[in-house]
Amino acid sequence: MKNNSFKKIILVTTLALTTNLHAQENLDWSGPFVGLDAGYTWTTDEKNNASRDGFTYHAKNKDNGGLIGINTGYNFMMNEKWVLGFIGEYKTYDAQDSDVDLKDGVPDDVTTVSSVDQKVSLLAKLGYLIDSKTLLFITGGYATAEMSRHYDEVTPNRSEKHKNWQNGWSIGFGSAYNFYENLSANLEYRYTDLRTNDINIAMWNNAPQPQKVSQDEVTFGVTYHF
């Protein structure tokens, strides 16, 4: 009798522990979160059809390099499978390139040095849980990035620097996996179009240099869910 009672206690305790462990393993995706990420950017900063002195100029900078970022936001569970989220993120870059201007298709004595410095994005995210731990999602929204450009001319020997923010939109997709308690690992691809900005160059009588910027990025990150 005592042996049967002891077996029942063990069985009940085991079931309780198993249920509790299972509950801990299933992340509640709703609520606030904060995350860190790192990755690589392929940024194109293209000066196309810039006119001055009766000539047309072109340069294409490949500002490729590393990035790190931080993000925060809030998720809403729409039902058992669908997650709606809103995200604010900040990224800083180590990505720079230089290119010799083409003057009517011929290399000129002007070099354009370009770099992407930092970016801020405000995004919405729609995700689908394929199981309790794995979320597939798409994301999109507003993005603005600070660009630095240095225009160097050989003859006459002069140069001019500019910093400006370019606005546009961003869209992407990715996945998140709850690998431990309140932590998830994230892998994401993002495309960003920062459109075209005219940079007026004083040393060329304020001739506008149309600079079009676009980005492809791959990032890996870790998120903590509160």
Model region roles, listed by residue range:
Residues 3, 22-226:
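Gram-negative outer-membrane beta-barrel domains
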